[in-house]
Amino acid sequence: MRVDKIIFIFLISFILIYPFSVKAQVPPSREIQKAQAAEEARQFIREYTARFMKLELDPFMELFSKRAVENRMLPYADIREAYRKTIEGSRSIVYSLDIDSIQTYTQSANVTGRYKIVQGFKKGGKTVFGGDIQWDLIRENGSLKIREVNYGRSW
């Protein structure tokens, strides 16, 4: 009988010390989801910048949806050709970016900012230009892709 009491007391004290968790699984709050989506968009833009500066066309173009449009008029095939020419003629590209805002939605994000590009040419010399930029990102097959990118030039 004494052993039964000891076991009973041990079980009760164990339950009191380590209560069973019966919390319901609650989805993250809307604010947490928005913060996570904004961070995912920031990471995407960092990847965009890094891939562009590596001067490798195929990995860079993987970031674009096949339905992408640039500067409200260039379709994907023309975007690819323009970047191919840019990369072929470049010795180096330094791309810097300041993000002004990120707006997130269920399956997309809109990012605005200012960019600066320093492009060194294979034939010598360099050019510097920059301006406003806006990305419209969509989720395709679980990852973000560029649906639209619009470059402005202010200098």
Segments and roles (model prediction):
Residues I9-Y18:
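Bacterial N-terminal signal peptides
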Residues Q25, S29-R30, N110, V128-W155:
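Short beta-strand edge/turn micro-motifs at domain boundaries
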Residues M61-D98:
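Short solvent-exposed beta->alpha transition segments
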Residues F64, L74-P75, S101-T106, G113-I117, ...:
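A mature extracytoplasmic/lumenal domain signature
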